[in-house]
Amino acid sequence: DQPRSRGLGDVYKRQNYGCFHSINTFDMADANTHFYELQDVPHGQVHICKYISAVNQHIKECYVYTPPGYDRHRDRNYPVLYLQHGVGENETGWVWQGRMQFIMDNLLYAGKCREMLVVMCSGYAFEPEEDPVFFPGDFDKELTESVIPFIEQEFRCIHNRWGRAVAGLSLGSAQATLSAGKHPELFSALGVFSGVGLRLFREYPMGQYMQIFLSCGSYEEELHKEQERCQAMLLAKGNSCFQKTYEGFHEWKVWRESLHDFVQLLFQNEELLQDNTIYLKKKTYTSDIFCMQTMEESMLFFDPVYKMVRFDVDEQGNPAGRYIDMPRGIHMLDEHSVEFNLYAPGADKVEVDVFDCGKLELSRSVQHEGYWTGILGNLEKGFHYVTFDVNGIRVVNPDAPVGYGCFQTINYIEVPEKDFKYPLLRDIPHGHVRMDYYTSSQTGRQKLCYVYTPPGYETGDKSYPVLYLQHGGGENEIGWLRQGKIANMADDLLTQGLMDEMIIVMNTGYAFREDGTSHGALSSFGEELVMDCIPYIDTMYRTMADREHRAMAGLSMGGMQTQRTVFEHTDLFAWAGIFSGGLVIRDEEVDYCDILLNPDKFRETFHMLYVASVSYTHLTLPTKRIV
C-alpha cells in the first residue's frame, strides 16, 4: 500500500531480497523518480507462474508482466523481453527493487514503447551436488528449454526471434549475453546493464541483425571504457549498438534508467513480427524434491539457494569466482526435529522461539564460523512463526523463510503433515497468481491485491465464480499465498476434482480513513471491498458477477470482517467462511438475529455458511455454543 505521490527527499523502506539474504532497502525520492513511481495510469498485471527447470527439475516461479488490456485484446500476440537480475538477487528483484511494472505502465501510457510481456526468472540453475561457477552460470539451458517454451504455451506470444529480446543487470547481463550469443536464432535484441560479461562478445559472434544496448553508471569508469571498446567492435561488425552512461554507481538507479531507455528501442519493425510459428516444445519432468521446496518457499524467494559468492579473477583478469554453500537458517532434519542456524559473529547470546512449540538457546557452531546453531525436537505439525533474539534484540534470520505476521517481517517454519498434503507442490497444472492495483475510496491510496486464476484461464473464455479470501490480524495480502500456500492447495484440489474452478482474491484487510471514522479493529475494509475491489475484479476478470457465484472467507480478523461484510451485503454474497474468527449473533455493534435465528431466512440468504475453529482459541467456546 503506497502513497500515490511523494516529495523530494522522502525515504521509503522495504524488505527485499539481495546479497543472498532477506535485506532491508530504502529509496530516496529525487527530481527524476517519477518514471518508476506508481502513477494514476492504467496498470498492467504481474503474473506469478510456476514451471519446472530443465537443469535440476525444481519447480520455480517466474514473474510475468502483461500490459494493460492484455486480457481484453485476445486476438493480439505480444513480443517478450526476458529480463534477468544481478548476483545475490532473484526473480523478485526487477519487481520490488527495479519497479519494472511501473516503468512499463508509465511508458505505455505516454505512448513511448510497444506493448510487450516482460519475464523475470531466478537465474540460479544448479545441478545437485554441483560446485557451480559464479560466472556466467548455466541459466541458458533453463531459459531456452524450460522458460521460453513455458511462456509461449501459457501466454499469447510472438514465436520468432523478432519477437524476443533478452537483457539483464550485472550477472544477469552476462547470462543474457551468453544466451543471445549462443542462440542468435532466438533473440533479436540484447540489453547489457552494468555488464560484466563483455568478453562474451568476442567468444560468440552476435547475429548481424542483433540490436545491442550497453549501459553503465558514470562512476563505473573501467566498465565504461570496456563498453566503449565493445561498442566500437560491434559497430565494425555491422551490429546496431547503443551505449549510454547514467549518473550513478553499480546500483538500481542506473538499471531503472537503463530499462526505461532500452524498452523504447524494442520491437519496432511490425513486418518482422508477423511469423508466429511455434517450434520450442515444453518438456515434462518428475522430481522428489517438491516437499522440501514447499517447506522453504517464502514471499522473498520461491526456490531459495543457500549460497554466497567468492569473487575472484583468472590469470587474464576475467571473472572466475565460485558459489559457496551456506547453512540453511531453518533446516528440517526429520519429521519432528529442526536445526536452526543464525549468523551472528559478535553475539553473546542467541535464542530462537518457535511459536506454540518452545524456545531454544543456540550455541556457537563448530563447523561454520560466526554461526550459532541448535536443534529443537518434538515440534507440532503445521505452520509456526519463528523469532530470533540476539543479545535480547529481535532480528530476522535472512537465511530462513520470511513472511509478514504479527505486524512485522518474521520468519516461519512449516512442519509437514502426512495427513494433509494439499499444500505440497506437485508437477500438475498450475494456475497463475496476478498482482493487481486498484484505488481505495476509503483511504485514497493504491492497494495491491493478489488474484489466483485456475489453470486454463489464460487460454479459455469461460467465466468463473470468485472467492474473496482474507488474512488474519497482523498479516497482510501475502499471507494466504505464502504462509497459507493457497495456490498450491487450489492446484491440487482442482487436479483431484475436489474443488470447482474459481478465482481467488487476496487483499490487505487494513483500510483506515484519515479522519479516524473507521472501525477500530476491522477498519473500513468491508466498504472498500464492496465499493472498490469487487467492481475492479468484475471489470478486469471474467467473473460470474452475481451473489450466487461470489463468496468471502477469512481467518481470525479476516473471519470477523467476512461476517460483517457478508451479513451486511447479502445482495452480493451467498457463501461465507469464518475460520477461527468467531460467529456473532448479536453484540453492542450488530444484530444478526433476523438471519441466524430464522431458519427460512437463513436458507434464503446463504447457500453455505462454513464456520471452523480449533480446540484451543478464546473464540472456540462461544462459536461452538452459537453453532
Q: What residues fall within each predicted segment?
A:
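Single conserved hydrophobic/aromatic residue that forms the stacking wall/gate
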Residues: D1-L8, Y12, H618, T623-I626
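Cap/lid segment of the alpha/beta-hydrolase catalytic domain
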Residues: V87-S146, F150, G473-D532, Y536-T539
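Short beta-strand element of the alpha/beta-hydrolase
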Residues: R76-G86, Y450, K462-G472
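The feature captures the conserved acid-bearing segment of alpha/beta-hydrolase catalytic domains
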Residues: V196-E251, V584-L619
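C-terminal catalytic histidine-bearing segment of alpha/beta-hydrolase fold enzymes
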Residues: E220-T286, L619, R625-V627
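N-terminal cap/lid segment of alpha/beta-hydrolase-fold proteins
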Residues: I23, M28-D71, E339, E414-E458
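Primarily recognizes the serine-hydrolase "nucleophile elbow" in alpha/beta-hydrolase
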Residues: N160-M206, D546-Y592
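Aromatic-rich carbohydrate-binding modules that target alpha-glucans
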Residues: G9, K13-I23, A320, H331-L333, ...
